[in-house]
């Protein structure tokens, strides 16, 4: 599996994630530029990550240096933040993202969460008063306008349950191309994958390694005994086993490392397959969702429980 392996929609199967704790523009710019030189072509960002500008700078530098022939050789995903998840704010928000990226379009624009906040609410912690009802129809109609204007080649969602996708599909004139959600061997998303496959929606995995080291991540994936046993028996790293498993599900995956050796390793999971026995053992791993989205739940907000946020699909 290489960085150039693509879905039917033209999205590279492996993307480099850029969610970081606090703004670090120069290290991100350098890491993205090196990733392009190594062979990455898909970069995942979001307004909330504050990494759009350094990605744009790295992309421009890569074109100047000849690492890629043009911006068109790259696939850039960004996301609409909750405070702009209002019908009249979506197009302006994407235009702001494009200014940050110094680009005329993004390849994929996603609704980051099925959540709306008051305009201007960008940084956690959030209060109950920050949340307002999510007008899915108005937001999606504005997302469709982004596509019609040529600002986004494709549009999609993130962190949507089967139920929310079903609601969206009931009125969408342009269906979502992608649903980006947590997927890893500890949270395998069998029901959601089957639903998306039946609707022609590409599942894209974030946190395929469990987001160890983040404020909400867990060691549960990398420390799973089954995965460690398989890795040892195959002469692979646990990360390679996880990424190979996600790849074999047909999902795209977003993986983040700014360490060059790991960036290379994350691309180099081709030329081997998990055995049926290994797949069976992974399928039996006890399931638990890692990124629960607790910050979006409030007694006074639209989602009063995790069950409501995820429609019972956790």
Curated annotation (Swiss-Prot):
NADP(+) binds at residues 44, 158-159, 180, 258-266, 273-281. Its EC number is 1.1.1.285. The active site is at residue 49. Substrate binds at residue 112. InterPro entries: AKR, AKR4A/B, Aldo/ket_reductase_CS, NADP_OxRdtase_dom, NADP_OxRdtase_dom_sf. One of its GO terms (biological process) is response to iron ion starvation. Pathway: Siderophore biosynthesis. Optimum pH is 8-9. Residues 1-21 are annotated as: Disordered. Induction: Up-regulated under iron-deficient conditions in root tissues. Keywords: Iron, NADP, Oxidoreductase. GO terms for molecular function: 3''-deamino-3''-oxonicotianamine reductase activity. The record marks 79 as: Lowers pKa of active site Tyr. Catalyzes the reduction of a 3''-keto intermediate during the biosynthesis of 2'-deoxymugineic acid (DMA) from L-Met. Involved in the formation of phytosiderophores (MAs) belonging to the mugineic acid family and required to acquire iron. Belongs to the aldo/keto reductase family. This is Deoxymugineic acid synthase 1. The gene is DMAS1.
């Amino acid at each position: 599996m290489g960085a150039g392996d693509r879905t039917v929609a033209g999205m590279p199967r492996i993307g480099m994630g850029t969610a970081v704790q606090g703004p670090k523009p120069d290290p991100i710019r350098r890491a993205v530029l090196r990733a392009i030189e190594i062979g990455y072509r898909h970069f995942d960002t979001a307004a909330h990550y504050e990494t759009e500008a350094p990605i744009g700078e790295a992309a421009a530098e890569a074109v100047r240096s000849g690492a890629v022939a043009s911006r068109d050789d790259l696939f850039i995903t960004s996301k609409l933040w909750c405070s702009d998840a209002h019908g009249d704010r979506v197009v302006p928000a994407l235009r702001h993202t494009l200014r940050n990226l110094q680009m005329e379009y993004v390849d994929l624009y996603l609704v980051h969460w099925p959540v709306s906040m008051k305009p201007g609410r960008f940084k956690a912690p959030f209060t109950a008063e920050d949340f307002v009802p999510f007008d899915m129809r108005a937001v999606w109609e504005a997302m469709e306008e982004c596509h019609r204007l040529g600002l986004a080649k494709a549009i999609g969602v993130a962190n949507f349950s089967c139920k929310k996708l079903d609601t969206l599909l009931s009125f969408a004139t342009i269906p979502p191309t992608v649903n980006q959600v947590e997927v890893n061997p500890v949270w395998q998303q069998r029901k959601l994958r089957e639903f998306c496959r039946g609707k022609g929606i590409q599942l894209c995995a974030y946190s395929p390694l469990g987001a160890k080291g983040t404020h909400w991540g867990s060691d549960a994936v990398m420390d799973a005994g089954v995965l460690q046993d398989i890795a040892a028996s195959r002469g692979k790293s646990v990360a390679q086993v996880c990424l190979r498993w996600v790849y074999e599900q047909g999902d795209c995956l977003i993986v983040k490392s700014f360490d060059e050796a790991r960036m290379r390793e994350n691309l180099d999971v081709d030329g081997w397959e998990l055995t049926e026995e290994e797949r069976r053992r992974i399928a039996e791993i006890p399931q638990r969702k890692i990124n629960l989205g607790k910050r979006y739940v409030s007694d006074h907000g639209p989602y009063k429980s995790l069950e409501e946020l995820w429609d019972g699909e956790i």
